[in-house]
Amino acid sequence: AMLETEVTGITSDSSSAKVVAGGINIESDVVVLAGGVDNTPLAAMAGISIPQQDSPGVVIRTNPISQPLLSNVSVVYAPPLETGRPEIHLRQSLDGTAMIGEGSQESLARDDTQPHADELLARAAEYVPALKGASAIPVPVGYRPMPLDGFPVIGFSPKAPNLYLALTHSGVTLAPLMAQMATMEIVDGAQVEFLGDYRPDRFE
């Protein structure tokens, strides 16, 4: 296993692709790059340009809450109660913790302080009273994978024929479909026509 091992080189030719990780050369038929925000520097190792937007976001979590917060839906998006405030989104994990964020995927947020976490929890509790009394736990700023034009990147690149790229926001919703399409193209050699507008070479 090569988990959490830095990749220092990627090459591809007509017959194989090679990755250098931890000083070891790994050769395979195809390499799939699905590294989120790190896809840009990884692809650059193979001479492929995949520019991304800077898209920071902040969420908070709570301590475990024993009672279910949402009975009929898995996620709530709630409009702001005050002018100038972003909307709130909320979901509860199986362990009872709540994840709370604000704004849309276009929103840029970098405030991961405790005061901001407390304020965000208080706003969420206005919609879901069961959150009152919970503790807000800040989560460090996260960076969303976001191709420069906002659309997914999926497919082989002419510059590296055995390197398959997959990059998108939101991967949570699109990953199952993208995985199925990628499998068809990698394993079966199919060309999925509706992916034509999302190929990596559009940035070249």
Show where each model-derived region lies:
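Short strand-coil-strand connectors
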Residues: 20-22
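A conserved short coil-to-beta-strand element within the FAD-binding core of flavoproteins
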Residues: 3-16
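Short, hydrophobic/aromatic-rich segments at coil-to-beta transitions
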Residues: 15-18, 72, 162
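General beta-strand structural signal in soluble alpha/beta enzymes
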Residues: 2-3, 33, 165
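C-terminal catalytic lobe of FAD-dependent flavoproteins
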Residues: 125-204
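Short hydrophobic core segments
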Residues: 26-38, 179
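Active-site substrate-recognition segment that forms the wall
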Residues: 35-159
